[in-house]
Amino acid sequence: MASSRVVLILSISMVLLSSVAIAATDYIVGDDKGWTVDFDYTQWAQDKVFRVGDNLVFNYDPSRHNVFKVNGTLFQSCTFPPKNEALSTGKDIIQLKTEGRKWYVCGVADHCSARQMKLVITVLAEGAPAPSPPPSSDAHSVVSSLFGVVMAIMVAIAVIFA
């Protein structure tokens, strides 16, 4: 009877923990600098693992900047869609709904072409493994490490009480 109770508790715990491990992450583009000119967004993005369901949060002064979602060709040439397609609230949240490459630029003056205000990321499927492990400070790393430790403890408890 006690062993079936342990198995039930372990099963419920695994379900709850697996939902925590796949929780969406909000990425503040540029961290504390936000969406601004003269910032290296390539370097900012390189150690992050973006997954379907995550959100990009663009924080900026709406009187000075905007955000356009563009394709790779428009990204390379810093060409923009019509102005009415710009995101311009100053706190734009973009949910990453599909996997693949995503491109974002600022459409104000020369911010994209001369001031490097552009971002390209690769979005992975929800359960896809990361191409390489991110640094330990990354949100996904912390959750994954915690999940691994908790799972090891639960397996050890199950073996002891089985």
UniProtKB/Swiss-Prot annotation:
Induction info: Accumulates in roots, in a RAM1-dependent manner, during colonization by arbuscular mycorrhizal (AM) fungi (e.g. Glomus versiforme and G.intraradices); the expression level correlates tightly with AM development.
Alphabetized Gene3D superfamilies for the sequence: Cupredoxins - blue copper proteins (2.60.40.420)
Disulphides: C78-C112
Keywords: Copper, Disulfide bond, Electron transport, Glycoprotein, Membrane, Metal-binding, Signal, Transmembrane, Transmembrane helix, Transport
Pfam (any one): Cu_bind_like
Binding site for Cu cation: H65, C106, H111, M117
GO biological process terms held by the UniProt record: response to symbiotic fungus
Membrane-traversing stretches: 142-162
Subcellular location: Membrane
Membrane topology: Single-pass type I membrane protein
Keyword Transmembrane (UniProt): yes
Domain Phytocyanin residue range list: 25-125
Major place of residence: membrane
Residues spanning the signal sequence: 1-23
GO molecular function, one term: electron transfer activity
Residues linked to a glycan: N71
Coiled coil spans: none
Gene Ontology cellular component terms for the protein in this record: plasma membrane
PANTHER family hit by this protein: BLUE COPPER PROTEIN, BLUE COPPER PROTEIN 1B
Protein name per UniProt: Blue copper protein 1b
Name of the gene: BCP1B
